[in-house]
Amino acid sequence: MDSLAWRVAALLLGLLVECTEAKKHCWYFEGLYPTYYICRPYEDCCGSRCCVRALSIQRLWYFWFLLMMGVLFCCGAGFFIRRRMYPPPLIEEPAFNVSYTRQPQNPTPGAQPLGLPYYTDPGGSGMNPAGNPVAMAFQVQPNSSQGSTAYPPPPSYCNTPPPPYEQVVKTK
């Protein structure tokens, strides 16, 4: 009898589930009177007593939400990685160009001392190139053989190896 009780309980439970299951109640007009029919929960009513299996993906709002969040995350991560791997070039200020006036080919005698023009310290005493070795190193050579006079040649000490440590310490 115990097994009979379990069978009856299972049957009643099955009927309860069948009755409470979410079903779609559909209807359509056949002439002047509506005709009612029932579709399963995963089906949609199609009009004339037929049920069509519904695409449930349109009802899954969380699927679309997660999909859009995934797309936004991938775009953001790609943008971040691209900016880190290929940073934009630094915007540099325009180069500070020092303009100077060239001396005429035939200068008036006594107007300026003979020699090539040179740069000195702006706050300096304006010494002669012979007295200022740094000014000698940065002399401008307007008639250079390179064809471009945009920059002065490198200082002469750039082409020689540095002095030994002992020599530098002894001179101080």
UniProtKB/Swiss-Prot annotation:
Location relative to the cell: Cytoplasmic vesicle membrane; Late endosome membrane; Lysosome membrane
UniProt signal peptide: 1-22
InterPro entries per UniProt: VOPP1
Stretches of the chain found on the membrane's Extracellular side: 23-60
Biased composition (Pro residues): 151-165
Segments in the Cytoplasmic topological domain: 82-172
Membrane topology classification: Single-pass type I membrane protein; Single-pass membrane protein
GO CC field: cytoplasmic vesicle membrane; late endosome membrane; lysosomal membrane; organelle membrane
Assembly behavior: Interacts with WWOX (via WW domain).
Physiological role: Increases the transcriptional activity of NFKB1 by facilitating its nuclear translocation, DNA-binding and associated apoptotic response, when overexpressed. May sequester WWOX in lysosomal vesicles and thereby regulate WWOX role as tumor suppressor.
Name of this protein: WW domain binding protein VOPP1
Gene it is expressed from: VOPP1
